Amino acid sequence: VAQKEDNKAAVVEVNSETDFVASNATFKAYVQKVADAALETKAADLEGFLADKWPEDPSKTVSESLVDMIAVISEKLSIRRFEQVEAANGIVASYVHGGGRIAVLVEADTDVVNDEIREAVRNVAMQVAALSPKYVGEEDIPEEVRAHEKEILLAQAVAENEALPENKRKPQQILEKMLIGRLNKEFKEICLNDQIYVKAEDGKQSVAAYLAEVGK
């Protein structure tokens, strides 16, 4: 991860074949240089980025710098992807976990930037690293995903119901209520705003509620 002030950051994925190399100081230093280059690139895709001039030696490309590092490390390496995030009205925070195996960038809109806001957005980045939400809010879930999840949960509910003795089976309207409850629970687990905040003192506060509290 590389960051410029509060509003711009970049993250890169550079793969090695072994954990030994992944923890190597020379490799880590190179990955940081790649991230620094990704922070400044104007490239729209990986192919364009790899063709960029290597900041440390402009006579070479980023791709050629990788070839040089492979020769030093004596192991196959690859630059797999990069992302660059720039906040137009707010800040970008980063969080790196597991010795660099997981990296998260979070962009937040805010009119106020101070240490409390920076910490809050970084805490949200930590939340993403820990619980891997798929969407920001429930409104972001595509209809086809909703339909697929509903189909799966309905099949489970019907199977569970049919496995019961006939005199204990639930009527259709009860199954439908159960389905709504299960869907809501499922969506809360995959949507960042609705997830329980990992540092919630009461174990109940959602991420959205935490941010609302910080923003007061």
Language-model segments: which ranges?
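N-terminal assembly/interaction segments in proteins that build large macromolecular machines
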Residues: 1-216
